[in-house]
Amino acid sequence: MFINRVTILLALSLILFSCDKEYHAAGSELLLSTALKSKTFEAPVYSYQSKVNYFQTDGLPLAQLGKINLSGLGTTEANITAKLVVSQNPVFGRFTQKKEDEGDDDNSAVIDEKETVTQVYLEIPFFNNTDDKDGDGVIDALDLDPNDRDSDTDGDGLSDFAETNNNLNPLSEDSDGDGILDDVDQDNKTYDNENKIYEIDSIYGNRNARFDLKVYELKYFLSKYDPATEFQTQSKFFSNTDFFEKGFYGETLHDDSYQLNFEELRFNHKEDDPDTEDVDERETVETRLTPRIRVPLDKAFFQEKILDQEGSSVFSNDDNFSRHLRGLIIKTENFDDDLYMLLDISNARIKVEYEYDEVDTNGTADNTDDDTTEKKSKTFLLNFGLNFNTIRNNNSNTTFDQEVI
């Protein structure tokens, strides 16, 4: 009994002592009685301009073209060199060249199609601003209020959103130009709602400047892999690479004065559809292109290099074609004012338009007496492959003020 009482007393004592609160300042021994002091060190910082002699310019989604003079940086000029790529073994016209050559006794439609180039164009699109935060069909740069789709940019009493949804022009108070404002006009059917207004960006200097635009055949083989590394790594091309200066150019494909056009390009149908008597398709738009550089190229050159090679080994693989037609050099000269462009080179192309003969059997394949031969037309595209910029900077007469910051 005595032992139980002693045990209880000891337990109570431990409980009482454990409830005793005693505060200790954790880490107080780390604080010193003296305040921390620091010193200040001042040193001059020098900034200076350093010219970069060259840099890699291939593998980019854009290309530079033009000439511009910037204060303190001198004059910069940029040209483009590009490889061309095509699909393998293309067929021009309706039948393969082999079938044309061999003929077909059982098919009178198989003839020598006489494919002939009619037009060739080089096209390089501009970049255009498509930002439209409020989704009213008017890009922010032209929108009265880019954050309000009910804003009325053209002031005709209809919101931008309403006009876009009703196939009207939100940037014109009279979409069809008949003298009646859109908010009261009950007939706007003559307005082509597919017409677009573009806001072109990445063009610097005087957009109205004239210059000479020249396109040459490239005579240097642009290899995808670097022969200096035994073709183990991909080739790199730098801003100081100038194959024109080194003499690697052939025929002149275009040489003329040029001025940029920032309007949508529209092309009407070439032929009228006889089945639609009330509509003349030659007066309606067939194709629309965003604003771009678009210049004609030498037709005879592409007749020889492209159409006349149908069925040959030239089109059997990329290397064969690149050795046959190695690419283009695009140069600009003689600017009447500064103009420098960043272009959408990833969508650049050459468009070869051609016509060919086609037999119309008039639905009687077994009777050739009523067969007629007609001219048909098609388009063949050559896209840009590997490309790079040659960039020259002349700052020999430019002085820099080197200052201490």
Roles of regions detected by a PLM:
Residues F2-G137, A141, G179, D185-I405:
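Secreted, disulfide-rich extracellular signaling modules
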Residues D132-D192:
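Extracellular calcium-associated, cysteine-rich motifs in secreted modular proteins
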